[in-house]
A protein has these predicted regions:
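Alpha-helical promoter-recognition and RNA polymerase-docking modules of transcription initiation factors
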Residues: 1-98
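Charged, low-cysteine interdomain linkers and short loop/connector segments
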Residues: 92-115
Length: 115
């Protein structure tokens, strides 16, 4: 797999961001690059769906970026990879809901119950 974001550079930018209280422009660029690459692991019916999932991922990054604790770990890449995957998957689940049965029948009854 190609290296598209340096873990060391990402860590340094996140530390700078935490000191400032907001994400630096460079950290936003690096995180957007990660989102673009990670979004490729999902399959989408339309390009707009991919863009929506990427937006969900960015929303999660903006919501949770300050939860990264550099005192506990220097691996910001792993933290943000998981955050991005979770956000992308939230969007994907919303767009492509799993089809499930909405009826229950029991072997004792001949009835079918609607949920």
């Amino acid at each position: 797999m190609a290296v598209y974001v340096s873990g060391k550079e990402l860590f340094e930018e996140i530390v700078k961001s935490k000191e400032r209280g907001e994400l630096t422009p460079r950290s936003i660029f690096l995180l957007q690059k990660m989102i673009k690459e990670i979004s490729k692991i999902f399959t989408y019916s339309r390009e707009e769906d991919k863009e929506d999932c990427m937006a969900f991922a960015m929303f999660d990054v903006l919501l949770y970026w300050n939860r990264f604790n550099p005192e506990k770990s220097t691996n910001a890449f792993a933290f943000f990879t998981q955050t991005i995957k979770n956000g992308t998957y939230k969007g994907w689940r919303r767009l492509y809901k799993e089809k499930s049965s909405k009826f229950i029948s029991t072997s004792q009854d001949s009835g079918v119950y609607n949920i």
